[in-house]
């Protein structure tokens, strides 16, 4: 897996463009996509390209880190792919974190931007009041207008590589401070390939499978392993 996540995504788009990529079942009691949501690979690629343009135009690039607080919404996955395409690391925020824990994460990862929902804006602002850094914020529903301009140039010169940082995942912090785990593009794709190659009851037929994963996208299982397992095989999560 000597490629970037964007390269892997584009390869699957070319092979399985009309196949479903992300799906959310209908649920009238849920606060979003009550009627359900589904997007195929080709349309997802178009959505990702639009996000890439917004991030790039605002000056975000290789080596920046964006804290993402979108809970388990499919938009999280689209933003992650867009961020990674530019060499930006995706730093998911556990929605159950208390303000002090969020403050630690934002300060420790040196976030360059916070992408959030309207519903979690207050907790994020409370967290921001506990640190000395001023991190720009953008509500997801307003992202089409573009995020605030980056406060510093892209830290890394040169193209995105398989060794570039793709995600920075934080542990639950139950026994101490949450610990940040750096995952490269190569690591994430290899994790997905491992999942796709398990076989047996877990055999994934290219372009034919769906996985229902109720686990949180800030966790490595749903956000990385099964996500890239399906992406690499043209499946749907």
Segments (PLM) and residue ranges:
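Conserved AMP-binding/adenylation subdomain of ANL enzymes
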Residues: 189-210, 218-237
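A short N-terminal helical cap/helix-turn-helix that marks the beginning
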Residues: 1-27, 46, 166
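Conserved ATP-dependent adenylate/AMP-binding module captured primarily in the ANL superfamily
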Residues: 97-127, 146-150, 191-212
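ANL superfamily adenylate-forming
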Residues: 26-37, 119-162, 177-178, 189
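A short helix-loop-beta submotif of the ANL/AMP-binding
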Residues: 65, 71-91, 95-99, 108-113, ...
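Conserved AMP-binding/adenylate-forming core of the ANL superfamily
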Residues: 22-73, 77-81, 98-103
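Conserved AMP-binding A3 loop
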Residues: 37-42, 166-193
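Conserved pre-ATP/AMP-binding loop-to-beta segment of ANL
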Residues: 2, 17-20, 151-170, 176-177, ...
């Amino acid at each position: 897996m000597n490629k970037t996540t964007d390269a892997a995504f584009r390869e699957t788009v070319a092979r399985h463009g009309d196949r479903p990529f992300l799906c959310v079942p209908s649920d009238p009691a849920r606060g979003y996509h009550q009627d359900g949501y589904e997007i195929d690979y080709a349309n997802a690629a178009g959505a990702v390209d639009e996000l890439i343009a917004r991030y790039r135009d605002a000056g975000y690039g290789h080596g920046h880190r964006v804290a993402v607080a979108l809970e388990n919404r499919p938009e999280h996955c689209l933003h992650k792919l867009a961020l990674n395409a530019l060499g930006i690391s995706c730093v998911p925020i556990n929605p159950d974190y208390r303000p002090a824990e969020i403050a630690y994460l934002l300060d420790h990862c040196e976030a360059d931007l916070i992408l959030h929902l309207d519903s979690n804006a207050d907790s994020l602002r409370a967290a921001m009041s506990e640190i000395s850094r001023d991190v720009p914020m953008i509500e997801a529903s307003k992202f089409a207008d573009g995020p605030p301009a980056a406060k510093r140039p892209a830290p890394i010169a040169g193209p995105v590589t398989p060794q570039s940082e793709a995600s920075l995942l934080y542990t639950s912090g139950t026994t101490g401070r949450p610990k940040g785990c750096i995952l490269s593009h190569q690591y994430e794709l290899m994790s997905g390939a491992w999942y796709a190659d398990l076989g047996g009851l877990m055999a994934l037929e290219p372009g034919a499978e769906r996985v229902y994963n109720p686990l949180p996208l800030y966790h490595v299982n749903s956000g990385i392993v099964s996500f890239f397992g399906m992406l690499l095989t043209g499946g749907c999560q």
